[in-house]
Curated annotation (Swiss-Prot):
Keyword RNA-binding: yes
SUPFAM superfamilies cross-referenced by the UniProt entry: Nucleic acid-binding proteins (SSF50249), Translation proteins SH3-like domain (SSF50104)
GO biological process, one term: cytoplasmic translation
Protein name, entry field: Large ribosomal subunit protein uL2
Disordered: annotated span: 32-53, 221-273
Transmembrane segments: none
Organism, scientific name: Erwinia tasmaniensis (strain DSM 17950 / CFBP 7177 / CIP 109463 / NCPPB 4357 / Et1/99)
Amino acid sequence: MAIVKCKPTSPGRRHVVKVVNLELHKGKPFAPLVEKNSKSGGRNNNGRITTRHIGGGHKQAYRIVDFKRNKDGIPATVERLEYDPNRSANIALVLYKDGERRYILAPKGLKAGDQIQSGVDAAIKAGNTLPMRNIPVGSTVHNVEMKPGKGGQIARSAGTYVQIVAREGSYVTLRLRSGEMRKVESDCRATLGEVGNAEHMLRVLGKAGAARWRGVRPTVRGTAMNPVDHPHGGGEGRNFGKHPVSPWGLQTKGKKTRSNKRTDKFIVRRRSK
């Protein structure tokens, strides 16, 4: 893994910082685990924009990643590490002893030739997946389930992890990167170690075009628009004279958006601001 700062041979390369990993596979992905990935342009089934600033970008194929890690008792060998355009983390192609291949999230330190395993009998080492009742308190884990058997949902981005801080009854208490402490059933699975490719946060795209390759469109301020386009638009000068709102007139900046009261009881401590 190397951090490369480009020489300023042009305005577009002046600020570019790349993360180069020579261990990544340079060929095509494993075809049986690849699906077509259609772009939405940020529109829903009515054709209306639901998420702004999305559109265009290079065509990408979706890699089917195994977040459940439910192939118990069968050891697997890591064949290679690969780039995945759909996520910040790298992925690993693993070959199970029975001949099946799957993609998994590549933990920190995993390399080709390593052995991994899932299930209650798996060793306590990075890359192995166990129910959290079988993982020692204080361990660092990633790809954590919120419901048993549903598949990992917490800590899947590059460099992320969760710490198991307590075990009480049928629940374990987790400390998330945000500072939140929450309870999860101890039968939920997690993978030991932290997600690899932590250097992803150090990259600098360097130019607007690099964002467009990724399907990200420009973000235009509401005050720079006309009244027909945004509640902040129009007027003389730059003051819009009201509380900040979204393009649809809903209050923004500080308004609470979480309405899931059903799971509030599992949050021991709110995330730190």
